[in-house]
């Protein structure tokens, strides 16, 4: 309790709850007007709070719960309790057979090897695939139910519970999520339900080696009493940062070609030549040509013209602009290389 109080300084649960509700409404207005929020219901605090927030934001008729037990789930009554409390529609999809079938197919092809991490993470990824199958079928948006504390130490499965279309709780600690759950009037047994790993029955805090209260205080204040715990948290955070980043991608930049004009050349001739070259290599595609006029290093005007192989591109007006200009930059937006035309 001491740690929770220290991490909750100046946290206004009602104001934050109202802000999230407004944000959810705005998200759906812009990214799925008329769609339903699809929430994976585990019966824990995170899915309970997200579902309740969506009900307040969209109405219970626009929230659909998906219960996804892996075989027999001893605590599934908590999930039923939540959907009944909120009055939302739901379905139950048992993922056990999907997991078993994949393991049966993959394991023999990998030298009969099946890692512990695979067993831990595959159910989360099967659940996310299930949520998207439901969402696309009914016309919905999948809610991510991760919180800041779990994300901070990598306690989420990439492309599993770490996926989703919108994330109401990802900037809030476990302690703060609980406070919002109480503000929403959720039953205390759902707010305080202890999460387990679903494999050995160990709690999250057993596996982490520290409590969420300690972690939350450290995240919000930078304060921690035990230096060994601090080192453990810092190591886990650094090791798992990649889960929160966009997928690395190769950066490709179009090459820039510079043409130096003498006094006898005109911008019109050079531009026409490059447009013709583009058409020869790109068949019948139109190209957008951006003409940027610059004096003394400052941009003064920028025109955009569509050049079509069916309609001869006319840039004769460039001749009037060319007098006294330092350079004209011509860029083909749809794939043509950047062309900088400089006058001697």
Language model: regions and residue ranges:
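Exposed low-complexity, polar/acidic, P/S/T/G-rich flexible segments that act as propeptides
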Residues: 270, 333-344
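Short, surface-exposed alpha-helical segments at coil->helix boundaries
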Residues: 47-51, 76-80
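Noncatalytic modules at the cell exterior or secretory-pathway interfaces
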Residues: 275-280, 320-333
């Amino acid at each position: 309790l001491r740690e929770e109080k220290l991490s909750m300084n100046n946290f206004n649960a009602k104001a934050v709850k109202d802000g999230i509700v407004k944000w959810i409404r705005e998200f759906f207005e812009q990214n799925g007007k008329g769609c339903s929020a699809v929430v994976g219901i585990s019966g824990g605090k995170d899915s309970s709070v997200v579902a309740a927030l969506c009900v307040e934001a969209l109405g219970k008729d626009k929230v659909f719960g998906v219960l996804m037990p892996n075989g027999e789930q001893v605590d599934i009554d908590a999930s039923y309790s939540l959907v009944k409390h909120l009055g939302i529609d739901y379905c139950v999809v048992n993922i056990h057979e999907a997991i078993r079938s994949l393991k049966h197919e993959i394991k023999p092809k990998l030298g009969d090897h099946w890692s512990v991490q695979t067993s831990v993470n595959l159910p989360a990824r099967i659940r996310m695939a299930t949520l998207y199958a439901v969402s696309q079928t009914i016309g919905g948006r999948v809610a991510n139910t991760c919180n800041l504390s779990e994300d901070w130490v990598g306690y989420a499965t990439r492309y599993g519970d770490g996926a989703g279309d919108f994330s109401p709780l990802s900037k809030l600690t476990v302690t703060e999520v609980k406070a919002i759950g109480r503000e929403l009037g959720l039953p205390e047994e759902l707010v305080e339900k202890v999460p387990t790993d679903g494999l050995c029955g160990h709690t999250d805090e057993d596996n982490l080696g520290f409590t969420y209260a300690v972690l939350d205080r450290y995240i919000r204040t930078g304060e921690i009493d035990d230096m060994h715990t601090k080192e453990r948290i810092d190591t886990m955070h650094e090791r798992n940062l990649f889960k929160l980043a966009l997928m690395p991608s190769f950066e490709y930049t179009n090459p820039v070609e510079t043409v130096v004009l003498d006094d006898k050349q005109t911008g019109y001739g050079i531009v026409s030549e490059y447009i013709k070259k583009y058409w020869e290599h790109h068949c019948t595609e139109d190209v957008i040509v951006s003409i940027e006029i610059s004096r003394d290093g400052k941009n003064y005007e920028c025109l955009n013209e569509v050049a079509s192989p069916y309609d001869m591109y006319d840039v004769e007006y460039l001749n009037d602009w060319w007098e006294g200009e330092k350079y004209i930059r011509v860029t083909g937006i749809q794939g043509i290389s950047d062309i900088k035309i400089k006058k001697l």
